[in-house]
Design a protein with these regions (language model features):
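Long, low-complexity, charged/polar intrinsically disordered regions in eukaryotic proteins
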Residues: 82-137, 145
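Winged-helix-like regulatory helical subdomains adjacent to P-loop NTPase cores
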Residues: 124-165, 175
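Long, low-complexity intrinsically disordered regions enriched in small/polar
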Residues: 1-49
């Protein structure tokens, strides 16, 4: 079987033969909208009656959402309408939203598309985003919740946490939103592995390490001053790294929220690395652990008790994300929280 295709080029246009796509340069938002809808109409399988109307309405809906978000986040991205690869990605998003009609999926597709307009050359991020647009429609909302939760816990660190109040806010706004949406069975995790969003390893990361271990300065029981004296630290300036323990004023604790911050402050003060190692070792032996730790965390955000159960039953500690899983998790985090850190922090 053969087919004959005839190209007709008008002013300011670039024709791409194969899968009916015509790209026109120098377009307005309204013209780009029409090009996008024409691409959908020409490439989506033909339906009849109500199904056709529904598919067209959904395609228009996601196209309008995309253009509105593009105008807000990346107005220069309008030039992507001249890129055949991007138009194919846009059609992928239209097609999947037309089939599913799911608002959550639509919002994630839009976020991925806007990020895609920022990649003019064939970068790794561009390849990852193209694949993410194809894969995300194969996932359920609870599987997407897994990606966002693992992304937040394993691949991000909040620099706005300085005390228990800000930590409590972090739990409520960055962790809790995904807990009730987690799947009930391990099969959901196996499907994430199958779609290339994650890998499941033999080794496991304890939830305690990810929730509290990133911010140990909040969970010190205090270092007895006699133990500090026994270390025979010969640098008096080390006292500037310590403060009275919030749980026991007769004891001391490291002033910094975590080890990275401690090392930065020690460098500024000229404290030796050997002394820092001694302080960290001593501090680790006087932190809240186990039930005592979770009692405090549960008081800040009760849903963490549910997360501990799911962490075990779903074996979430064994899950690490691929680049595609990170991109989808990142897009959903932005949808849920409004956070806007660039994807290039994790994929470059």
């Amino acid at each position: 079987m053969s087919s004959k295709q005839i190209q007709k080029a008008g002013d300011n246009s670039v024709n791409v033969q194969g899968d009916k796509v015509t790209i026109v340069t120098g377009l307005t938002y309204q013209e780009v909208r029409q090009v996008a809808l024409d691409v959908f109409q020409q490439n989506f399988y033909q339906l009849a009656g109500v199904a056709a109307d529904t598919a067209r309405d959904r395609a228009e809906q996601i196209t309008d959402k995309f253009l509105k978000e593009l105008e807000s986040r990346n107005p220069e991205g309008l030039a992507a309408a001249t890129d055949p690869d991007f138009l194919y990605s846009l059609f992928t998003a239209q097609r999947e939203h037309a089939r599913a009609g799911d608002d959550e999926l639509g919002d994630i597709l839009v976020d991925l598309l806007v990020d895609r307009t920022k990649e003019q050359s064939r970068t790794l991020i561009r390849i990852v985003l193209n694949e993410s647009l194809r894969v995300v429609s194969q996932l359920t909302s609870d599987q997407i919740a897994v990606l966002s939760l693992i992304f937040t816990l394993r691949y991000t660190k909040s620099y706005g946490i300085h005390n228990t109040k800000s930590f409590s806010k972090y739990l409520k706004t960055r962790i809790a939103p995904y807990i009730q949406g987690l799947p009930e069975t391990y099969a959901a995790l196996q499907h994430l592995d199958f779609t290339g969003c994650c890998s499941i390893s033999i080794g496991s990361v304890p939830l305690e390490n990810l929730v509290a271990g990133r911010y140990p300065g909040l969970f010190s029981k205090g270092i007895p001053q006699e133990e500090l004296a026994d270390m025979q630290i010969e640098e008096p300036i080390v006292n500037k790294l310590l403060l009275p323990c919030v749980r026991d004023r007769a004891k001391l604790q490291i002033k910094s929220i975590n080890e990275d911050a401690l090392r930065n402050q020690a460098t500024e003060l000229g404290v030796s690395d050997d002394t820092v190692k001694k302080l960290v070792k001593l501090d680790k032996s006087h932190r809240l652990k186990g039930d005592n730790l979770w009692k405090e965390i549960d008081a800040m955000e009760p849903q963490l008790a549910d997360l501990r159960k799911k962490w075990q039953s779903l074996r979430l500690g064994h899950v690490s994300l691929t680049s595609v899983g990170i991109a989808i998790g990142h897009a959903n985090v932005r949808r849920v929280t409004g956070e806007s850190s660039p994807l290039s922090i994790w994929i470059n």
